[in-house]
């Protein structure tokens, strides 16, 4: 018997320690597997710590086994991320997963996943309609789900958990999902006494502020970030034709022309704001930037271990 946690640990923090302790207490007979992203994340960010460091700290705090989520899944939209992660869970004959959930209503997530599975033709029609209107894929997906179910999934962890359960239901995997209550405040900039969201902690790290109250990890500047690689990104986009940029994975729908149009923005934040639109979310843009920076035409053939950035050195716990 085994249970899986699907994670990025960017960075690993006290909330993750609590999740591991909760899982060990409530599933004492199960080995805990972490399906862990590597050096790049689903939002298109460079991980603050590399895969080896994240693996070591997870093992220190209670995980039994670490399985790497391949780059081709780890740096994709939520539905592809979930597809890859749950596929790995099934391949390793792990019969349970547990994830944080704001609603903590796993039965409702199963209900919605079954509705989706039974109404895929209608769902896909609504999805295509919303995409034609210029919605981003996440918003189009939310629109389609609401049309077939009358419900909205609002919170980010519920959305990702729903994607996990969709994969379980669609593939009839012998996996049972469980949830761990995650408070809404956990995600805000008003952290609990010793727990804060990874988003907030990344902000503190980037501002060179201590996160010792919230995490056992320590970071030394400069830390890894797309902002620090923006000059290199500018150079590549300027020197590469739109035709050749379009050969890179995720560069489609004319986003290469949009990048060229705004490539003279003076910094990463202004570039992101200029390119962001109803169709292109920040995460979609950042994922495309990663693929351009490392010239990735086929993510299934990309060996991220060959990318060794100085900013990963001396980051640890």
Swiss-Prot record:
Record localization: Cytoplasm
Catalytic reactions on record: cytidine(34) in elongator tRNA(Met) + acetate + ATP = N(4)-acetylcytidine(34) in elongator tRNA(Met) + AMP + diphosphate
Binding annotation for ATP: 6-19, 100, 157, 182
GO CC terms: cytoplasm
Keyword terms, alphabetized: ATP-binding, Cytoplasm, Ligase, Nucleotide-binding, RNA-binding, tRNA processing, tRNA-binding
Primary role: Catalyzes the formation of N(4)-acetylcytidine (ac(4)C) at the wobble position of elongator tRNA(Met), using acetate and ATP as substrates. First activates an acetate ion to form acetyladenylate (Ac-AMP) and then transfers the acetyl group to tRNA to form ac(4)C34.
EC number(s) reported in the record: 6.3.4.-
Gene Ontology biological-process annotations: tRNA modification
Signal in keyword set: no
Pfam families for this protein: HIGH_NTase1
Gene for this chain: tmcAL
Gene Ontology molecular function terms on file: ATP binding; ligase activity, forming carbon-nitrogen bonds; tRNA binding
Enzyme's top EC category: ligase
Family statement drawn from the similarity comment of this UniProt entry: Belongs to the TmcAL family.
Record's protein name: tRNA(Met) cytidine acetate ligase
Entry-linked SUPFAM superfamilies: Nucleotidylyl transferase
